[in-house]
């Protein structure tokens, strides 16, 4: 089998089992949607971000519903460490166990704290979705009625050392995911949501997309491009015509995808890319994150792809969703 074909098949496998940039895997047992405990709960407390807990303290974290003994999974990839959420207090020792995961790869710069958890092992690298332990009773040290509160584990998410709201990284997560194979975090070139004269002045994001040097290849190869949205129609974009009205030029290529499901009403346009020959154009089912194209490798091709997003036909700014800063579903008016 040709090495580049083999590489593509590996990419397909990664895509099938992969994780969307900015979206966490499930944390507990059968709680596939990472549902939070009731708000208000039986004692009036709440498990949402920046709300009052049973102790009366305002917590910048969330309580994911989870019964005693249910398996706990790593929501992100990273390096795992044992952590004591109650700082070694003897009277709370039965619940003073947790985990800290320092993010790597797509989650570089993030850290997740989960408590209370009895760990199956106490360190090392974990992939998102790996089983790491089981849930403990967070109120085992207190017999004053908290047993009526929905059982849960507490999640705190840090970015560059600062607590942030993990809600839309855990629930209803709607980030685009990684767009270019050689850019795991959708690093942008220049300002976000900018106008680019190279593509007839369209407005969007210039996503870095370097050629890839494989050890088993003599020359760099063009990186794969992943669909930022789920779609059902794929079409071709040709920006320029010659004096005879013909579309010519190696770098005169791009694609558009018409959204479905959570992306209904959206359209993604990608410039400086060439659709995979085996996909072609027309009506077909495209899964978000599916490898659908390669970056162009023409003589003057930039080391980037340009992404334009429209909603109901109008160009919209979804910078936070592209960069995974916030994966909340945008609330655009329907025109």
UniProtKB/Swiss-Prot annotation:
Glycans are attached at residue 317. InterPro entries: Dup_hybrid_motif, LECT2, Peptidase_M23. One of its GO terms (cellular component) is perikaryon. Zn(2+) binds at residue 63. It is found in: Secreted; Cell junction; Secreted, Extracellular space, Extracellular matrix, Basement membrane; Cell projection, Dendrite. Expressed in body wall muscle cells, along the boundary of the lateral hypodermis, seam cells, processes of the nervous system including commissures, sensory dendrites in the head, and lateral nerve tracts, and motor neurons and some mechanosensory neurons such as ALM. Changing residue 74 to V: In gk751884; does not cause defects in the formation of the somatosensory dendritic arbor of PVD sensory neurons. One of its GO terms (biological process) is regulation of dendrite extension. Belongs to the LECT2/MIM-1 family. It comes from Caenorhabditis elegans. Changing residue 103 to E: In wy953; defective formation of the somatosensory dendritic arbor of PVD sensory neurons. Muscle-derived dendritic guidance cue, which is required for the formation of somatosensory dendritic arbors which extend from PVD and FLP sensory neurons during development. Ligand of a multi-protein dma-1 receptor-ligand complex, which is activated upon binding of lect-2, mnr-1 and sax-7 ligands to control the growth of dendrites that extend anteriorly from the PVD neuronal cell body. Enhances the binding of the mnr-1 and sax-7 ligands to the dma-1 receptor-ligand complex. It holds the Pfam family Peptidase_M23. The keyword Zinc applies. Changing residue 101 to T: In gk609178; defective formation of the somatosensory dendritic arbor of PVD sensory neurons. This is Leukocyte cell-derived chemotaxin-2 homolog. Residues 1-20 form the signal peptide. The keyword Signal applies. Keywords: Basement membrane, Cell junction, Cell projection, Disulfide bond, Extracellular matrix, Glycoprotein, Metal-binding, Neurogenesis, Secreted, Signal, Zinc. One of its GO terms (molecular function) is metal ion binding. Changing residue 259 to E: In wy935; defective formation of the somatosensory dendritic arbor of PVD sensory neurons. Disulfide bonds join 28-66, 39-46.
């Amino acid at each position: 089998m040709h090495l580049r074909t083999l590489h593509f098949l590996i990419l397909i496998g990664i895509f099938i089992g992969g994780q969307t940039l900015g979206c966490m895997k499930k944390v507990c047992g059968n709680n596939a949607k990472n549902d939070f405990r009731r708000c208000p709960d039986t004692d009036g407390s709440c498990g949402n971000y920046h709300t009052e807990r049973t102790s009366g303290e305002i917590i910048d974290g969330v309580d994911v519903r989870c019964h005693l003994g249910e398996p706990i999974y790593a929501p992100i990839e990273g390096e795992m460490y044992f952590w004591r959420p109650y700082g070694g207090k003897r009277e709370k020792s039965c619940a003073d166990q947790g985990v800290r995961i320092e993010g790597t790869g797509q989650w570089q710069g993030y850290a997740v704290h989960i408590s209370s958890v009895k760990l199956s092992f106490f360190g090392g690298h974990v992939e998102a979705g790996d089983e790491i332990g089981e849930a403990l009773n967070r109120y085992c040290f207190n017999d004053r009625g908290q047993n009526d509160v929905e059982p849960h584990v507490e999640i705190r998410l840090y970015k560059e050392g600062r607590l942030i709201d993990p809600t839309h990284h855990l629930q209803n997560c709607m980030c685009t995911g990684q767009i270019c194979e050689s850019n795991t975090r959708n690093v942008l070139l220049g300002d976000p949501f900018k106008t680019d004269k190279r593509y007839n002045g369209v407005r969007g994001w210039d996503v870095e997309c370097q050629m890839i040097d494989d050890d088993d290849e003599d020359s760099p190869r063009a990186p794969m491009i992943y669909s930022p949205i789920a779609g059902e129609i794929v079409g071709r974009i040709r920006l320029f015509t010659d004096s005879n009205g013909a579309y010519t030029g190696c770098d005169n290529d791009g694609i558009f995808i018409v959204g479905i499901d959570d992306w209904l009403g959206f359209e993604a346009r990608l410039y400086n890319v060439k659709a995979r020959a085996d996909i072609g154009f027309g009506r077909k089912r495209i899964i978000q994150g599916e490898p659908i194209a390669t970056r162009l490798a023409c003589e003057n091709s930039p080391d980037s792809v340009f992404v334009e997003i429209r909603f109901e036909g109008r160009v919209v700014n979804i910078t936070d969703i592209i960069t995974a800063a916030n994966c909340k579903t945008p609330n655009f008016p329907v025109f």
